[in-house]
A protein has these predicted regions:
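GIY-YIG-like beta-to-alpha core
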Residues: 23-32
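Active-site and NAD+-binding cores of ADP-ribose-processing enzymes
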Residues: 1-23, 36-151
Length: 151
């Protein structure tokens, strides 16, 4: 599958700093999230590189996610069933009464990182998530800058 990432500037080096760590967001279509003319990259992935967020806890190695679920539960002050539901996208942060409305967007981004981390723990390169743009893919790009094709 061919996916696209747009950036406000040329990508020289990918690191694990920042909100989404080593994961970059990709879309099935070119999108713009910046006022400036974006730098557009494409990436080829196979279906076996990707797991859907909704399938994470159905994977045969889902028990490996126990620590990650506990970490999110503690961070958000929710039970582990709720944390799991957030990671697999069957529940939204907007459904959690203890999360203030003004914090919900930031928390939802934090949860997306946990979803990507879950996929990586299970041995996948990417996870398909749903966000305000529809289907999106969070792809582990650490050390893989050369795989980005400038469009």
């Amino acid at each position: 599958m061919k996916l696209f990432h747009t950036s406000p500037s040329k990508i020289e080096k990918i690191n694990s700093d920042g909100r989404f760590g080593e994961f970059l967001f990709f879309s099935g279509n070119v999108y713009t999230m910046t006022v400036a003319a974006p730098v557009v990259y494409s990436l080829e992935l196979t279906d076996s590189d990707v797991i859907k967020a909704s399938q994470l806890f159905y994977h045969e190695d889902a028990a490996k996610l126990t620590g990650l679920v506990a970490e999110l539960a503690e961070r958000l002050g929710v039970d582990e069933d709720t944390a799991e539901a957030l990671i697999e996208e069957s529940k939204s942060v907007y459904d959690i009464d203890s999360i203030e409305a003004e914090d919900a967007a930031d928390v939802s981004w934090d949860v997306q990182l946990f979803t990507a981390r879950a996929a990586k723990i299970l041995g996948f390169r990417a996870v398909q998530v749903t966000d305000e743009q529809g289907a999106a893919w969070m792809v582990d790009m650490l050390g893989r800058e050369s795989e980005l094709t400038l469009q």
